[in-house]
């Protein structure tokens, strides 16, 4: 269950008016949802509730799983200082260890409907802020 209004309220409660966020995520967040209503989508609600201006960075389409898997694995293998806090992020660690792919290489969320969502967040983060890593790495290696 996700309640975007509660999430925004929790962010406001934690940070007040003293914050600068850059928001990214799933391209499907641009879709209207029956859960939201009023012809809104999640990103419009986030922008309005958090009073954001130009801090929204959402791809037109989600990255392909196979491409983001290569990017994610490359970042972890080439940046050994990239560490995920085991105490603070136990569910992300579990996703990274145990989420499986289906025959077409996509995350198999049918095996466990509670797994895979946080690895998606990590994929979207890497895709939004580090998508040029492989190109830069390959250029530096030449």
Where do the protein language model's features map onto the residues?
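Mg2+-dependent endonuclease catalytic cores in nucleic-acid-processing enzymes, primarily RNase H-like
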Residues: 1-109, 132-133, 139
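Phosphate/NTP-binding elements of NTP-utilizing enzymes
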Residues: 21-25, 108, 116-126
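Intrinsic low-complexity, intrinsically disordered terminal tails and linker regions enriched
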Residues: 118, 141-142
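Short, hydrophobic alpha-helical segments
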Residues: 125-133
């Amino acid at each position: 269950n996700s309640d975007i209004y509660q999430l925004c309220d929790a962010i406001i409660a934690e940070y007040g008016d003293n914050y600068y966020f850059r928001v990214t995520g799933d391209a499907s967040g641009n879709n209207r949802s029956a859960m939201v209503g009023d012809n809104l989508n999640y990103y419009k609600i986030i922008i309005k509730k958090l009073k954001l201006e130009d801090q929204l960075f959402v791809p037109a389409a989600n990255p392909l799983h196979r491409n983001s898997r290569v990017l994610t694995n490359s970042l972890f293998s080439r940046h050994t200082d990239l560490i995920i806090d085991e105490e603070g992020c136990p569910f992300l660690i579990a996703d990274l260890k145990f989420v499986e792919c289906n025959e077409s290489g996509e995350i198999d969320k049918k095996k466990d409907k509670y797994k895979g969502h946080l690895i998606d967040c990590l994929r979207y983060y890497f895709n939004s802020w580090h998508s040029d890593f492989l190109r830069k790495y390959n250029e530096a290696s030449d």
